[in-house]
């Protein structure tokens, strides 16, 4: 999404879904994965007559609440949505004015969509043409419509294309920048958005700043450290600007291309140490490779309130340390919700026993590594003390201009926490006559200044900027192929100094665009751009003139820096339709993809995997467990609901293999790996597909490894990880693993 209109975050919010007239859920199961948030979907149905549409390989609990359901083959979401747009264009249901005024490149989409007739879509996706037609007409005629997705769209080799085709569908229908519309990504946990915002990714700095010399120097200035000192922490200066390893493939850095593993480029050295902070290691694919990577480390450190799976599945006998970390109830600070809202959390109890909050452990590490002074320089007071976490919140707000965290203060967020009941759940607006009147709950970013109320719905030009309005971000230049990339006249937030598109605000254009004259003092203090203006003057001046600092551009359907400039269907690496792999092949292999050589077409076309592994494999979640399950499987009551790992298998497929309900079965993958699990025989999956929940750990390929748990820490529920048999495959842009589509074979154990 960030490459479509500037930000890669949920555009609206859960309460706003109640304003939708139709809800298109593709690659998500909110009834199970977001059960509290799902009540907003049900209220939209009950109170607003919204039509609920679900597209999924399984008949899920969300599908059980749907008005319309399509059971799709895993990995074919792009053909389905192109099929929808084929019908939309054919029937003239598109929003022509929105397309003309606020988008670029839809003509290219129109050409591609013409190829995806209902009959072609049926052949590729398995969804009957009549079902596609019915769903498309309902969605097109019931606007505003909201598109909702989660990991079901992203965890594919073409995940980045999936998350572009859904926004393009919304642009075609004019469902963006309106209440009840938008692209509403459901994050897996409450602070996934906050973790993303703070750069828990290897290719950017906090706030999604690119790793280039200008931004590193900006951060050095704001952190009050020497740029040369920062640079000196890298083995060579150029490594300062390179992406690191991803969570999905860190282990490749340990294996270092040896014994047939994919080659790596890591300055001529292998990874020696790993620190795992609150991340379930079994939540990523290729667990046998993860295990090999763990075994090859010299040092493994785990920060967790519970025993991390990494310490259990490894065969290491030394060099493994478990540091007891405090839970969220034993510390305080901010998290960022799925809708970009900040939430303050207060400490409930002091850390128990010898546990410590994460930040204290990391401060101790920084002291021993010799850079505690630099790390804390801007958050220590005159007496060398740190007011935690308030000082950290202020530091973040002062630096991260790019997503507009500038308006967040501890005082504002605490006030919202104390008055959470005084906000309207559908609009997030503070109620009249209260101390939070005029502000949106959690100050959803961008919150440009301390007087700004936050932005509940992104890209809404019907509101003034000082009420959360904005156009699409100007992030991709002023023109492409001779076409102006700025929004048309009349497509700007109401009440602003500009009536149409304008570029992002910089020191050298602010006077012209805003129609102001800067003082010499303001010019001297001001940074070069709105995103690197440490003085805050650009944002303040923009608010006075009703201008969003990041500009007002067109959303683009064509991403000219991507391999696929418009989304293209490419078959999964392990596809049951080798005939379609020849027609819609994967990408060319990609060297140095986050430092690791990554196979695509060479693997996909090397053989017809479906002859030996004829069954589709997809993975997902359960309502009673979370993530890798370290915490939730330690609950006796939650574990009683699903005490053993299982596979959902269709009754006919089970009968074909002589399998009865709750028999043990072996599941084999093309990687040569296997798991032993129970069979749950249910009709919710198709005859050619099995489903695996991924919350278990403690067994590896039939081997009991629970003896590695320290005494008294073994969870109530243990079992095989689904990700032991998840197939090789990684997104071409992000390297997220392809866990939602793969192949396997089954046999009775």
What are these regions (language model features)?
Residues 1-191, 195-200, 219-475, 486-496, ...:
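Cofactor-pocket helix-loop regions in the catalytic cores of large enzyme subunits
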Residues 161-168, 627-639:
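Surface-exposed flexible segments
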Residues 209-212, 709:
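Extracellular hydrolytic enzyme modules, especially secreted metalloproteases
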Residues 212-219:
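Loop-to-helix "switch" segment enriched in basic
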Residues 225-262, 464-604, 608:
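Long, low-complexity, polar/charged, intrinsically disordered or flexibly structured peripheral segments
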Residues 613-615, 625-627:
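N-terminal intrinsically disordered, low-complexity segments enriched in P/E/S/T
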């Amino acid at each position: 999404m960030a490459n479509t209109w500037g930000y890669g975050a949920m555009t609206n919010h859960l309460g706003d879904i109640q304003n939708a007239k139709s809800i298109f859920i593709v690659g998500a199961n909110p009834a199970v994965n977001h059960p509290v948030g799902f009540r907003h979907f049900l209220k939209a149905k009950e109170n607003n007559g919204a039509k609920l549409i679900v597209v999924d390989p399984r008949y899920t609990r969300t599908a059980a609440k749907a008005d319309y359901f399509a059971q799709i083959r895993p990995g074919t979401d792009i053909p389905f949505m192109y099929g929808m747009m084929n019908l939309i264009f054919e029937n003239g249901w598109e929003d022509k004015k929105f397309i003309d005024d606020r988008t670029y490149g839809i003509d290219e989409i129109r050409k591609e969509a013409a190829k995806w007739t209902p009959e072609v879509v049926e052949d590729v996706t398995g969804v009957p043409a009549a079902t596609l037609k019915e769903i498309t007409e309902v969605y097109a005629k019931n606007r505003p419509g909201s598109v909702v997705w989660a990991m079901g769209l992203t965890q594919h080799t073409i995940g980045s294309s999936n998350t572009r085709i859904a926004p393009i569908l919304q642009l075609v229908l004019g469902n963006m920048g309106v209440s009840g519309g938008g692209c509403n990504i459901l994050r897996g946990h409450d602070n996934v958005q906050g973790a993303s915002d703070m750069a828990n990714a290897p290719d950017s700095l906090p706030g999604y700043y690119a790793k280039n010399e200008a931004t590193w120097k900006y951060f050095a200035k704001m952190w009050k450290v020497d740029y040369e000192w920062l640079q000196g922490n890298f083995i060579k200066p150029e490594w300062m600007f390179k992406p690191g390893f991803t969570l999905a493939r860190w282990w490749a850095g340990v294996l270092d291309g040896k014994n047939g593993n994919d080659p790596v480029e890591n300055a001529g050295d292998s990874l020696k140490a790993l620190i795992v902070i609150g991340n379930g290691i079994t939540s990523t694919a290729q667990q046998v490779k993860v295990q090999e990577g763990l075994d090859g480390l010299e040092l493994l450190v785990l920060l967790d309130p519970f025993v991390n799976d990494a310490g259990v599945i490894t065969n290491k006998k030394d060099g493994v340390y478990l540091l007891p970390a405090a839970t969220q109830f034993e510390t305080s600070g901010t998290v960022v919700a799925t809708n970009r809202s900040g939430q303050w959390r207060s400490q409930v109890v002091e850390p128990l026993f010898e546990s410590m909050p994460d930040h204290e452990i990391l401060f101790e590490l920084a002291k021993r590594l010799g850079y505690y002074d630099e790390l804390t320089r801007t958050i220590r007071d005159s007496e060398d003390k740190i007011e935690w976490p308030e000082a950290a919140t202020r530091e973040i707000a002062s630096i991260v201009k790019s997503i507009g965290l500038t308006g967040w203060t501890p005082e504002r967020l605490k006030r919202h926490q104390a008055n959470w009941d005084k906000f309207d759940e559908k609009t997030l607006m503070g109620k009249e006559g209260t101390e939070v009147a005029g502000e949106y709950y959690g100050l959803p970013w961008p919150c440009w200044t301390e007087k700004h109320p936050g932005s509940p719905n992104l890209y809404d030009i019907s509101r003034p900027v000082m009420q959360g309005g904005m156009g699409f971000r100007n992030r991709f230049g002023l023109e492409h192929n001779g076409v102006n990339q700025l929004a048309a006249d009349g497509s700007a937030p109401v009440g602003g100094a500009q009536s149409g598109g304008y570029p992002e605000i910089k020191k050298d254009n602010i006077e012209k665009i805003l129609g102001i004259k800067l003082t010499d003092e303001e010019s001297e203090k001001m940074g070069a751009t709105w995103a690197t203006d440490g003085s805050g003057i650009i944002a303040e001046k923009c608010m006075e003139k009703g201008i969003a600092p990041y500009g007002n551009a067109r959303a683009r359907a064509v991403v000219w820096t991507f391999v696929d400039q418009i989304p293209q269907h490419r078959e999964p690496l392990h596809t049951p339709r080798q005939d379609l792999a020849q027609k819609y092949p994967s990408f060319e292999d990609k060297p140095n993809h986050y430092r690791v050589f990554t196979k695509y077409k060479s693997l996909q076309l090397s053989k017809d995997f479906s002859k030996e592994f004829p069954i589709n494999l997809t993975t997902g979640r359960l309502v009673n467990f979370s993530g890798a399950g370290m915490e939730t499987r330690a609950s006796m009551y939650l574990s009683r609901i699903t005490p053993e790992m299982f596979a959902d298998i269709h009754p006919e497929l089970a009968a074909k293999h002589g399998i009865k309900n709750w028999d043990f079965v072996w599941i084999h993958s093309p990687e040569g790996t296997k798991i032993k699990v129970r069979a749950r025989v249910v009709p919710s999956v198709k005859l050619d597909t099995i489903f695996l929940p991924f919350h278990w750990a403690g067994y590896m390929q039939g081997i009991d490894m629970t003896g590695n748990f320290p005494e008294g820490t073994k969870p109530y529920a243990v079992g095989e990880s689904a990700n032991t048999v998840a197939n090789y495959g990684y997104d071409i842009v992000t390297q997220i693993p392809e866990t939602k589509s793969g192949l396997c074979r089954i046999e009775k154990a």
